[in-house]
A protein has these predicted regions:
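Conserved catalytic cores of very large enzyme subunits
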Residues: 1-277
């Protein structure tokens, strides 16, 4: 990377579970664990900015939408999809629930696209992930929130699709670089997708001009959170005599969601071509 030095931590994907338990205390902040949708969004912005100041590259939060859905359900109930058009803000605006959700989307996304002084007045490099149902259940099937509850696929699926459509439309009004998005789709190991609905939705979003990465895997043991980083748990025990590494790029994290990279060098081919001519 032309802007940095080798050896400095480049990018990282984090698990947000400690954030749910301790808030920002362990990072030197004063905010305790978020308790509702409003505090979650505000503290999440501070979380990403705090971590990004320690890295030159991306901060990936694959669980962002799953946690956002958790706090929406805490505030408005597990059946909030049945009340999207209900007025939930009794002020002069009289906003419906879906409008409130859109406003939180806007708060988080627009804040992430603001230049940061501790990053040379560049924005944070923020990545998120989407999952089809099979991939989601493979990665988060045994996951439980601190209160013992489990993620709810039906509401998360709606939230993922709604965010993608909202973000695609928002980019028609503003120049928004982040988040960089990765859609994780599980295949049958041959030439087809297990969750055909999400495969069709992915194609639909591309047809609408949306720009995002797509990660295909025949096993939910691995995860990609950005353009270059992939990790795999089950392949750790495989040995290839031709080299001494596996596909599990493990340097800073502790799980399939939490990982990172170091000394990543990006070749700027466009610049090389310009200099050569």
């Amino acid at each position: 990377d032309e802007s940095g030095t080798p050896g400095y931590p480049y990018c990282v994907a984090i698990t947000m579970y400690p954030f749910l338990v301790d808030g920002l205390i362990k990072l030197g902040g004063v905010s305790v664990a978020p308790t509702d949708l409003k505090s979650f969004c505000g503290e999440f912005i501070n979380l990403v900015y705090s971590i990004s100041s320690q890295f030159m590259g991306a901060v990936a939060t694959p669980e962002f939408l799953m946690y956002l859905d958790y706090f929406i359900r805490k505030d408005y109930g597990d059946d909030y999809l049945d009340h999207l058009e209900d007025v939930v803000e009794m002020n002069t605006k009289k906003r419906t629930l879906v409008k409130v959700i859109d406003n939180y989307f806007q708060q988080v996304v627009h804040s992430m696209n603001m230049p940061a002084g501790n990053r040379g007045y560049q924005t944070v490099f923020w990545n998120i992930s989407y999952f089809d149902e099979s991939y989601f259940r493979g990665v988060f099937g045994d996951f439980r929130f601190p209160d013992g509850s489990e993620p709810k696929w039906e509401t998360l699926s709606w939230l993922q699709k709604h965010f993608m459509n909202w973000f695609n439309e928002e980019r028609n009004r503003y120049i928004l670089t982040f988040p960089v998005e990765t859609m994780a789709l599980l295949t049958d190991g041959k030439d087809d997708f297990i969750d055909k609905e999400y495969a069709d939705f992915t194609a639909e979003m591309w047809s609408k001009g949306h720009s995002f990465f797509c990660y295909l895997s025949d096993s939910p043991d691995s995860l990609a959170s950005c353009c270059r980083l992939r990790n795999s748990i089950t392949e750790l025990d495989k040995v290839d005599e031709s080299h001494n590494h596996t596909t599990h790029q493990y340097s800073m994290g502790t799980a399939s969601v939490s990982t990172g990279s170091k000394s990543v060098m990006t070749i700027n081919l466009n610049r090389l071509i310009q200099l050569a001519t």
